[in-house]
Amino acid sequence: MQFIALTSIGIENLLVDELTELGATVSKQTVGSVRFEADSLLAQKVCLSTRFATRVLMLIEEKEGVDDKNSLYNFARSQPWQEWFGPTQTFAVDFNGTNDSLKNTQFSGLVIKDAIVDYFNDLFEQRPNVDKQDANVRVVARLNRYGVSMYIDYSGPRLSERGYRQGQGKAPIKEHLAAALIKRSGWLENVNQPLFDPCCGAGTILIEAAGMARNEAPGLFREGFAFERLPSFRAAKFKELKEELLGNIIDPKLWLIGHDYDAQVLGKAIDNAKRAELDDIIKFKQSDATKLTAVAKLPGVVISNLPYGERIGSMAELVDLHRNLGVGFKKHFNHWKLALLGMDESLFKLLKLVRLKRYKFKNGPLDVELNLYQLDDKQVSLTTDDKKALNFEGSMSFANRLKKNKQGLKNWLKQNEITAYRVYEADIPEYNVAVDIYGDSAVIFEYAAPKEIDEKTSEKRLQDVISLTAEQLKIAPENIAVKVRKKQKGEEQYTPMAKQNRTMVVEEFGAKFKVNLFDYLDTGLFLDHRLMRRYIQENAKDKRFLNLFAYTGTASVHAALGGAKAITTVDLSKTYLKWGQDNFDLNNISNTRYRFEQADCLKWLEHATAQYDLIFLDPPTFSNSKRMKDAFDVQSDHIKLLTWVKKILSPSGTLIFSNNKRGFVMDEVGLIGLGLKAVNISDKTLSPDFKRNKKIHNSWLITHG
């Protein structure tokens, strides 16, 4: 009988060795799978014993030239289905693969389903029912460029789901991948040596390690396998097999230690260990991996699935973690072996360790790599006691500028009650970032590097920027958000991650605003508009104020605090309007004439008839809008936009027009044609923290001529 064992990319060689050790004959290895020959009892032993396979399928038949509906139907119809189930049982069909004729996997699955139903109708005048969730038998078909392979699901649900893990942390590791790390680490060569995971999360690596060291077949305590529903299954033989495997379990002296800083996740690890009946073997402790200390007097092996940065803005924490891990390992883990899993090569380099070997894997959809290190005397001697060792000595120029800029803003910040401000704006060309402070937190925004700058050099400089920002500004790494521009699939973009939902309140000129530094590209407050908002507050008394493209309504808050008699806040985003209402609540603002309207601002202008005495217009540089035949571009379309706004600007009203397009040129002729006049106030709207970047925005006061 032929079977195929499925696994994840990178684990195939380990699976081949495992199958061979179990007595199976391996006939073919491909990406993500291994084909082997075995009798039914040996195949059942594989299902019970495998640490590396995720699923085992039994081959029914494979045939070349099956490439359309008719040939697929005939191929499925010709199989002796009564050998595997009867007309009173249920079945399901999984189909994988497409071609020019079979373009839809669901349709192809239905073709096979129809063939099976017709087969039983002809043979028994009775048909089995389909049960997609809990079928007695699951048929699996795989289409490739040569033809179709037909299988019966032999193992059932994922073999990697051992049953002990009901709780997990962020970025969990799959059990079969954890087993692969343990095997590759070399720890199994001497299971009496300590095994330590400083970022243990839900404890998966340690629980897998204990099971492997005890020679425990992971499927022994599984509730059931798909093969138990097949006619060929012999319960007595299977019982004997399980008793044999139970007898193979040993009880070595194990020294397993797991640390994690997250008490909640650590609680899940403890619960998982209890379910695996290993809670008396594995010792868990809440501890910060950035402050490593010795965990054993004898050297052992460190195996850890390091954090990947699964949350946007967590890069600062990752840089801090890896730099401190490197120092901690060298100080307290001499003669230990390290096996560390991660995604980012540049972060591994922060360990300042010479890699012994590297293995590439997949953790779900993520490309990850396992790096092996040997902490011998030579490795340890490479370090210094300075945990903030920089990639470049020249990075201290950034640190000095950061410190100087902050000191220079100190009096101005205090006088104006400002707690959110820019402290660095690409002052030094090599350090092409902006750094904004928000209370006890910060945002580092990386600008696109020139093409001639090597990407790895930029990464290293950014790492230094992160460390020095934390050090010089005395901000905890977990409170530093980093917005990094990276190339992905040919496009340069900022990639959002899972949201943290962390908000805080900042102040300016007596106003309070809610900001979110981690979940979006922008924070909820455009710092460069600060003086425009103050102008609005100072000139809003008893006026009708309109805020277009309002974002989180911060200008509207200032208008309200300035005594505006009516305020209309318009934005397309429901999220941002709700945010704006939160800002009103923060400032105890309540008035029936203060309205929020969700709308496309260009579309809204088409129907607007009310008059406004003070208007703030801050359109995007570029946008798609149903109001425009083509996409909106502020340079080419600003006169058209001002034409619409003019209609609702009261005779003595003032329009504050601003945009962020570099090199923007006002169409003065077009403006005169509209009967409007404009005064450029760009320089006057730059507060001290933005004086270093005079091109941050363009702004005008526009009135009727």
Swiss-Prot record:
Catalysed conversion reaction: guanosine(2445) in 23S rRNA + S-adenosyl-L-methionine = N(2)-methylguanosine(2445) in 23S rRNA + S-adenosyl-L-homocysteine + H(+); guanosine(2069) in 23S rRNA + S-adenosyl-L-methionine = N(2)-methylguanosine(2069) in 23S rRNA + S-adenosyl-L-homocysteine + H(+)
The task this protein performs is described as: Specifically methylates the guanine in position 2445 (m2G2445) and the guanine in position 2069 (m7G2069) of 23S rRNA.
Provide the gene name from the record: rlmL
- What compartments host this protein? Cytoplasm
Give the main location.
cytoplasm
Q: What name does this protein carry?
A: Ribosomal RNA large subunit methyltransferase K/L
Where does the record place the THUMP domain?
A: 42-154
EC id:
2.1.1.173, 2.1.1.264
Q: Which organism encodes this protein?
A: Pseudoalteromonas translucida (strain TAC 125)
Which InterPro entries does this entry report, sorted A to Z? 23SrRNA_methyltr_KL, RlmKL-like_Mtase, RlmL_1st, SAM-dep_methyl-trfase, SAM-dependent_MTases_sf, THUMP_dom
Q: What class of enzyme is it?
A: transferase
Please give an example of a GO cellular component term from this record: cytoplasm
Source taxon at top rank: Bacteria
